[in-house]
């Protein structure tokens, strides 16, 4: 059997379900695939197919995640669902499954619960740009006023974490009833799909973003100059483009005088490609792995930032013991380790393996960074944690 070709006619959007345990995230995921496959084509996935999430490794961390896809008339969606709370935390922090938007599932019978709050906070910290709400189990609540109260509570909670609570689409429904074939509740799933189409804007493609290439290797070619190699993370570069070398040392501006891939000369290098970039007037020793090549003015070097971090358990190959304030591990950004010190939130004395925590990090060298950049925490080359830059301080 030949593999069917993935037709990319429609824009592709990454979404996922978040919310408190047992509020119906997986049931909703199954309901969406079931209802939309009937209406628009695609593959229906049963609850147990989604619930038995396969293990994946992201940055050395084991995460259970289910991936499903579905279509609306205008878009193709890739949707992630995680079985356990810890999987959500790891998924969001490592960026294993980047989300352009999230569907927050809240059971109308319970209202917002501790993990509801925690997932909204995580979404804010790791830069999930849009949240929609599916108010689930509405068939079990007879009182319309009660539904209204729960809705208000959810809106207030979203606003607390800087999401536009008042303007957030909230769809009232029942995932289970929709799965069982109840037409009125299936219509609510279609309504949710329409809301996804309308509320989550089409994300900017990597190729349209400003050029950035993390430098992996540097060598000099006699008579031609210095070449840096790496994979273009975003944007594109053309011969004679002006570029900045950012991070670790003072920022330097230079010009790209040639681009090559597999020993062939190219006119341009694009997002996703491994290329060598020839730089004008730069000596081999002026540049090192861990710096980035970037479009001038598009990214700055920083040493201090607030981070959201997950610390690996012993079983995941992490530390066996807690760490305390003044802990000095290495922070691995893109292609290199930089030593840094940490400050813990007030009232937190120690961090245990398996915890997720907010911390303030100060690096000994500046690194090119923006909010949302992922990193690993390492001790002597062994990964002990994963993190994301929540907010650059300086």
UniProtKB/Swiss-Prot annotation:
Per UniProt, Mg(2+) binds at 26
Identify one Gene Ontology CC term for this UniProt entry.
cytosol
Where is the segment annotated G1? Answer: 19-26
Region G5: list its residue ranges. Answer: 174-176
Residue segments, region G4 = 136-139
Keyword list, A-Z: Cytoplasm, Elongation factor, GTP-binding, Hydrolase, Magnesium, Metal-binding, Nucleotide-binding, Protein biosynthesis
Spell out the SUPFAM superfamilies in the cross-references: EF-Tu/eEF-1alpha/eIF2-gamma C-terminal domain, P-loop containing nucleoside triphosphate hydrolases, Translation proteins
* Catalysed reactions, as listed in the record: GTP + H2O = GDP + phosphate + H(+)
Q: Where in the cell is it found?
A: Cytoplasm
Q: Which domain of life is it from?
A: Bacteria
Give the region (G2) as residue ranges. 60-64
Q: Which family does it belong to?
A: Belongs to the TRAFAC class translation factor GTPase superfamily. Classic translation factor GTPase family. EF-Tu/EF-1A subfamily.
Q: Which NCBIfam families match?
A: EF-Tu (TIGR00485), PRK00049.1 (NF000766), PRK12735.1 (NF009372), PRK12736.1 (NF009373), small_GTP (TIGR00231)
Protein name per Swiss-Prot or TrEMBL: Elongation factor Tu
Q: Which organism is it from?
A: Hamiltonella defensa subsp. Acyrthosiphon pisum (strain 5AT)
């Amino acid at each position: 059997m030949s593999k069917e070709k993935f037709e990319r006619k429609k824009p592709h959007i990454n979404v996922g379900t978040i919310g408190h345990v047992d509020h119906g995230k997986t049931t909703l995921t199954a309901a969406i695939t079931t209802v939309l496959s009937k209406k628009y084509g695609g593959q229906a996935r049963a609850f147990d197919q989604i619930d038995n999430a396969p293990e994946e490794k992201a940055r050395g961390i084991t995460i259970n995640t289910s991936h499903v896809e579905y279509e609306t008339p205008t878009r193709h969606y890739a949707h992630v669902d995680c079985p356990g709370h810890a999987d959500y935390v790891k998924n969001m922090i490592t960026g294993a499954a980047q989300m352009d938007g999230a569907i927050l599932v809240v059971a109308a019978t319970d209202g917002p619960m501790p993990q509801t709050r925690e997932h909204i906070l995580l979404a804010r910290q790791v830069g999930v740009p849009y949240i929609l709400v599916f108010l689930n189990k509405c068939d079990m609540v007879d009182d319309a006023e009660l539904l209204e109260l729960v809705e208000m509570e959810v809106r207030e909670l979203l606003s607390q974490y800087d999401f536009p609570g008042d303007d957030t689409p909230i769809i009232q429904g029942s995932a289970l009833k929709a799965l069982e074939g109840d037409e009125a509740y299936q219509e609510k799933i279609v309504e949710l799909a329409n809301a996804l189409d309308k509320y989550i804007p089409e994300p900017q493609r990597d190729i349209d973003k400003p050029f950035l290439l993390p430098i992996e290797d540097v060598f000099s070619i006699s008579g031609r100059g210095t070449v840096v190699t790496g994979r273009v993370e975003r944007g594109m570069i053309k011969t004679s483009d002006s570029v900045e070398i950012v991070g670790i040392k003072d920022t330097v501006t230079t010009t790209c005088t040639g681009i090559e891939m597999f020993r062939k000369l190219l006119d341009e290098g694009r997002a996703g490609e491994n290329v060598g970039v020839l730089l004008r007037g730069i000596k081999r020793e002026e540049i090192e792995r861990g710096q980035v090549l970037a479009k001038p003015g598009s990214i700055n070097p920083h040493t201090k930032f607030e981070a959201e971090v997950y610390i690996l358990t012993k079983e995941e190959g992490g530390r066996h013991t807690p760490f305390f304030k003044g802990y000095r591990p290495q922070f691995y950004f893109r292609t290199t380790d930089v030593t840094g010190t940490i400050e813990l939130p007030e009232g937190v004395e120690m961090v245990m393996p398996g915890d997720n925590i907010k911390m303030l990090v100060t690096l000994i060298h500046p690194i090119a960074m923006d909010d949302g950049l992922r990193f690993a925490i390492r001790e002597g080359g062994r990964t002990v944690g994963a993190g994301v830059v929540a907010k650059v301080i300086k």
